[in-house]
Structures are given as C-alpha cells and as structure tokens.
C-alpha cells in the first residue's frame, strides 16, 4: 500500500497503482464526523481509556449499544484497539482483599461477552494495532471482524500469571 493525495493505493502485478476501493478511514465512522455517512443506522462503540483498556464503563457501553438494537461497530482509531482488561482495577481489589469484587468484575466481563455473541444483531469489530487479552476476547465474540493489516492479536494473560477469563 502507498498513501497518496486522495487515499491509499495498492499495487497489483503491474507497476501501476490502483485506488483502494475497500479503504475505510476509521475516523469517518465517528459520530462527530459525518454521522449519516452510511446508509444504515449503526451504533459506534469506542474505548477511550488509557491504552483502550476495558473497565466496567466499557462493559456498560457495549451493553447499552446492544440495548439500542442497531448493528454495532466496535472500532478504535489509534495504536491499540484494546490492551485488554485494566489490570490496575483487579490489582487494587486484590490489594484491598476485595475478592468478591474481582469475581463480580470477571463475571460482568464474561456476561458482556456472551451477550455480545448471542444478542441477535450484527456485531462488527475492526481492530488495528494491539488487540490483546480482553480486547482479543471482544474481537472473538463479534459476528464479523475486519482486521487492519498491522493488527496484533493474542491472549497474553499468562505472561502476568493469569488465565484468559472473558469468554
């Protein structure tokens, strides 16, 4: 691929560059930019925490999007799609001895993933950059995945002594 004045171009077997008609600029899906660009209604979900980590608010956002009833597009324009669950939340609960809260947090994440999988409406994820840990589990629960060429997917919880628990 090569970026020129009006977008990305790709090279076929010949030396000529052809416009990439399948290019989707991630920023074009933002509700603030062209909210009616597409011919069908959809709900745009974007994680906006540091490194797009997942926390209870992220789970609530996904559940709210499902309740709206439109197809769901989970997309983030940045270096990370999602670096997974915010382990600082889990660490804080562990240091305080709040084991029940850790269990509730994990169950909430598991329920959210299952609701995503079986909600009956299309859930589309478009990961780019890192989609690791819980972020990868969100991608796995989607009905459709449109991955960027630079995406890095994986379950990396074992590197910090945990097991994947989202779904």
What are these regions (language model features)?
Residues 11-21, 62-65, 143-150:
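Short charge-dense sequence patches
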């Amino acid at each position: 691929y090569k970026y020129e004045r009006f977008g990305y171009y790709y090279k076929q077997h010949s030396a000529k560059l052809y416009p990439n008609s399948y290019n989707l600029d991630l920023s074009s899906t933002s509700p603030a930019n062209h909210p009616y660009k597409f011919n069908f209604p959809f709900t745009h979900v974007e994680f906006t925490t540091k490194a797009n980590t997942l926390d209870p608010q992220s789970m609530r956002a996904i559940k709210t999007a499902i309740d709206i009833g439109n197809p769901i597009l989970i997309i983030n324009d940045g270096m990370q799609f999602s670096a997974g669950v915010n382990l600082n939340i889990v660490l804080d609960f562990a240091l305080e001895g709040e084991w029940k809260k850790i269990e509730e947090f994990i169950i909430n994440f598991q329920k959210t993933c299952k609701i995503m999988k079986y909600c009956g409406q299309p859930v589309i994820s478009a990961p780019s950059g890192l989609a690791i840990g819980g972020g990868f589990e969100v991608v796995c629960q989607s009905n459709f995945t449109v991955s960027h060429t630079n995406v890095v997917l994986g379950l990396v919880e074992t590197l910090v002594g945990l097991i994947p628990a989202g779904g």
